[in-house]
């Protein structure tokens, strides 16, 4: 049959695009609301005019309230957060900030590396958190989710900052 070679290639491509040969399709996880109170230790440089730069580490425990399904009660899970940050903190000018973090869940069995980018003045920073890579249960993790944070400098203790962060709808994708 002469027309057979022309039909085999398109059918093969169609089947492969449906995931039969490539494995299951990626699954988006809607984890729910997440929040963290964090503490930072490092160096704070006073730039004058109320502007400061913080360079150091941020640590905290993220609490994620997983949405309930049916009559099941909501569950709260925790994830340890360790970050490196250089933050320009200004009362007058909205400044971009970048924070790099390792998240450890399930007694350290599951690791995720995230990059947080936000912009704002002292007290508030709005932006996104991007899942870069993961190991264990987070292997192959991707996605971007909205992020809001507050940053406060402890005037009494040298080199310490405090803050909180919130993810109203924490989501990510796993293969």
Segments predicted by a language model, with ranges:
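Absolute N-terminal positional cue centered near the fourth residue
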Residues: 4, 19-21, 29
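Bacterial N-terminal signal peptides that target proteins for export
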Residues: 1-11
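Beta-strand-enriched cores of mature, soluble protein domains
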Residues: 25-175
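Short non-domain terminal segments
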Residues: 1, 19-20, 52, 136
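Short, intrinsically disordered, low-complexity terminal segments
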Residues: 6, 21-23, 71
